[in-house]
Amino acid sequence: MMTAPKITFIGAGSTIFVKNILGDVFHREALKSAHVALMDIDETRLEESHIVVRKLMDSAGASGRITCHTNQKAALQDADFVVVAFQIGGYEPCTVTDFEVCKRHGLEQTIADTLGPGGIMRALRTIPHLWRICEDMTEVCPKATMLNYVNPMAMNTWAMYARYPHIKQVGLCHSVQGTAEELARDLNIDPASLRYRCAGINHMAFYLDLERKTADGTYVNLYPELLAAYDAGQAPKPNIHGNERCQNIVRYEMFKKLGYFVTESSEHFAEYTPWFIKLGREDLIARYKVPLDEYPKRCVEQLANWHKELEEYKTAERIDINPSREYASTIMNALWTGEPSVIYGNVRNEGLIDNLPQGSCVEVACLVDANGIQPTKVGTIPSHLAAMMQTNINVQTLLTEAILTENRDRVYHAAMMDPHTAAVLGIEEIYALVDDLIAAHGDWLPAWLRR
């Protein structure tokens, strides 16, 4: 083994995300001398990231080298780790298209990156590019491990392991560890005192056990405390990012009904189910404080904040950041050194969760060490949780089949099976919506869709 790994970042123009991941990497002793290859098709954004990464590296006392690439295969050559984080079509035009076309057809969305027409279109735009990365990896770094952060996570991960089963990859999200920290904050307890077991699908996994350590070293179930805090109006706390639009009511109400807390945010969960966003039901939007059009608003704000941050980074002598909650550096360190760690990853369901479809993409705890990323068996999850997940897996199954077999009919079927879409639109309206989305996206979508 070489003394230091090569880490390739595809989509390195996502500077804020690069900063978080590589800020963690540079503080790990075994990774300090890594060769970091930054790749993006946008040369301006690439140069911005280079400035930030160089200062991060110097500030952390890391001694590796940085190379910048607009050619993907060159960036991937002999890589040990491949971090993927990009958005095909960006906020403009593609995200705007997903929201505006759906709205014209009477379908409101909040985030639109995981399920529903927005998630379906994003998958169709994204998967061909992920496949090209797999092709290049097969040729120039076949032993590398891909750490995929691109949404829609389940469909993307599924499409890659279905077509390129030899590529070592895991889909990563921060919702499991992020929500655990959020719940600890709601109860004014130290996140380090938590112990939990979580399982499901990406953006719809549930804490099957959620406990905290007491003074005498024993663990107690945290759910009764959490429910009492919500009923007393003491939880949830105001949004940690200062976003007053996102008040987390949906998840707590679902917790009361289901008995288990879900990992992804209220604004996400509201559009994965048929109960919260309906035509003419402004009362539901008000009661559950559902932030419609949240993702476009967030994109505009983040872009404005980034320009301000970038100017500060350009003039700063040092860039010092706190550790992020992302798993990437933990995985790299465990694979490179053999020092074991546990992360939550999105992987193929091969006997991991018994009552979800085998072959579907599930999110479970994984042991990571020199043997690789090893998912752990969960067994059977509560039937009502599995039933809810199945409604989302239906969409993922059909969309993945659509793109693997180039079958346009399955795209309509995937949209028909989406719980939120089906609760709002009739069948003919769903077909018309899909037709308009395909026409509006044009060349951003695969050619077979437009034949």
Regions found by a protein language model. Give the residues of each.
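N-terminal Rossmann-like dinucleotide-binding module
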Residues: 7-32
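NAD(P)-binding Rossmann-fold cofactor-contacting core
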Residues: 30-54
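Long, compositionally biased stretches enriched for glycine and/or charged residues
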Residues: 188-451
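Rossmann-fold NAD(P)-binding glycine/threonine-rich loop
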Residues: 92-163
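Redox-cofactor binding/interface segments in oxidoreductases and associated redox assembly factors
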Residues: 77, 83-84, 148-149
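Short helix-capping segments at alpha-helix termini
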Residues: 29-31, 56-63, 164-165, 187-189
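Short acidic low-complexity segments
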Residues: 65-78
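Internal, well-ordered domain-core segments that constitute the primary functional module
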Residues: 132-214
